[in-house]
Amino acid sequence: MAITKKMLVVFLLAFLFVTSSVHCSDSTLGIGINQDWKKCFSPDPCKKAGTQGCMEFCRTISFLLFGECTSKPDQCCCVTK
């Protein structure tokens, strides 16, 4: 079975379409498009071990998050940076 030019073009276009739609990120380097994420939880991690406890709590949710303790109201907030 011979591969025709038409089949080759169809395969190439399908390959380009699939590869362009696979990698979608909320952050594009160099352009400055960024969607920050912040979610606050109970103050328990902050009460147990301070900022380090909050940091460890957020890292269990996702390795990309950082934790910070807030005082008004008392909460452990996980944010992206």
Swiss-Prot record:
Positions of disulphide bridges: C40-C78, C46-C69, C54-C76, C58-C77
A biological-process GO annotation: killing of cells of another organism
Major place of residence: secreted
A Gene Ontology cellular-component term: extracellular region
Keyword vocabulary terms for this entry: Antimicrobial, Disulfide bond, Fungicide, Plant defense, Secreted, Signal
Signal peptide span: 1-24
Subcellular location per the Swiss-Prot or TrEMBL entry: Secreted
Family listed: Belongs to the DEFL family.
Protein name: Defensin-like protein 115
